[in-house]
């Protein structure tokens, strides 16, 4: 993970700046299966809805979900299908993710 070449999320299509991913199975869509997700300091994920369940393990750093929940290194999280959220990382983080299906972007609520 430390020396692998991560692929930046396409900022124009996703709105994400400072995020990247490493797919372990390149034949699967970037949001499905198992992948490593990195957030640079100050990065935010795009608000999205999960089509299936998602599980993630915080390898290093910390991220804060839009509901204020803070996840730190060593935390394991399960998100139910249909969960809507986005995350922010003040100091950056690396997360191992398993997602059952693709994410759908949602517009931010006022």
What is each model feature region?
Residues 26, 39-51, 101:
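Short beta-strand/loop turn elements enriched in aromatics
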Residues 40-42, 60, 79-83:
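Short acidic (Asp/Glu) patches
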Residues 35-37, 45-50, 67-68, 87-89:
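Short histidine-centered beta-strand/loop micro-motifs
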Residues 81-108:
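Ligand-binding loop in jelly-roll beta-barrel domains
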Residues 1-31:
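A short, N-terminal "cap"/entry segment at the start of jelly-roll beta-barrel domains
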Residues 41, 50-66:
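Glycine- and acidic-residue-biased ligand/ion/polar-headgroup-sensing regions
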Residues 65-85:
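Short acidic-glycine-tyrosine-enriched beta hairpin
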């Amino acid at each position: 993970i430390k020396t692998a070449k991560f692929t930046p999320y396409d900022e124009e299509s996703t709105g994400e700046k400072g995020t990247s991913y490493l797919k372990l199975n390149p034949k699967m869509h970037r949001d499905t299966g198992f992948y490593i997700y990195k957030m640079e300091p100050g990065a935010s994920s795009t608000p999205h809805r999960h089509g299936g369940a998602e599980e993630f393990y915080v390898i290093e750093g910390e991220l804060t979900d839009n509901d204020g929940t803070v996840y730190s290194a060593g935390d394991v999280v399960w998100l139910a299908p249909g969960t809507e959220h986005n995350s922010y990382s003040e100091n950056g983080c690396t997360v191992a993710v398993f997602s059952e299906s693709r994410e759908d972007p949602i517009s931010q609520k006022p």
